[in-house]
Amino acid sequence: MPAERWSYQSTVEMSNEQFLLWQALLENRTGMQISPQRKSFLETSLTIRMREIGCANYDNYYEKLMSGLAGEVEWATLVDRLTVQETSFFRHENSFALVQDYCRRLYEKEGRKHIELWSVGCATGEEPYSLAMGMDDLIKDFPGKRYYGITATDISLPALAKARDGIFSLRKLERVEERFRQRYFEPVERGRSRVVPRLKDRVCFAQLNVLGLGDAPMQNVDVVFCQNLLIYFQRWRKRDIVTKLADRLAPGGMMVLGVGEVIDWHRPDLERVQYEDTLAYLKRKPS
């Protein structure tokens, strides 16, 4: 069927057997759990992509995803479509305030010269750039040299490409304080601004599937920031991911999660941080 004729048709209905097949594929490859209640979301997302490439049905599209290098490229595109990347700068203000207070203490009371942060599930970059703005603003309060580095990871290659570009619409910048907009962004074209190079240089973007955390090179991280990612996973997998993230913390390091994203989870080497409207843990230092 010619691709141009698809636009006149409704969403392709998916059988229960097909749904289970696609559900298993997504969970096995990404850990994402598509519940039966979200079947229509999956149908719509797949149908739109199938129309774009002229694929006739779900079975043919599934086979395409299994076909070598071309399938891997198409898989990267599909994952980008299925992961909701609606994010914003300073999305949860209390969590960013907590990070700044914690890092201030490291610089001020512990005499630290360098702090490492990790943004897990960074999407199109708003989260790590928010962390970078906070850190850059913080270090100017201290005499002498203070440094920081941010690693930002995501499964979506298209999202990472946008993050590396660092170009955002003015609408996206509405939540950014005016002083930060003036200091950390420069206009590039009408209605769009770009992160200034000196801030962009503090963030390293890399692809990472959280199912592969066991092989991730990050170690002894001072701050792990992971919000609006765990909502995609089943409870047992959430716990597994958080446990592996905690393994990457330096002694005394802090992990910041989305409020309400994890329940009934604890580790003896972590203690809950008491900070209003946040969910965070400190890794105890050896006695």
Each PLM stretch: what is its role?
Residues 120, 141-225, 229-237, 262-264, ...:
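Extended basic-aromatic, gly/pro-enriched interface segments that bind polyanionic ligands
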Residues 124-142:
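Conserved SAM-binding loop of SAM-dependent methyltransferases across substrates and taxa
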Residues 264-287:
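Core SAM-dependent methyltransferase catalytic element
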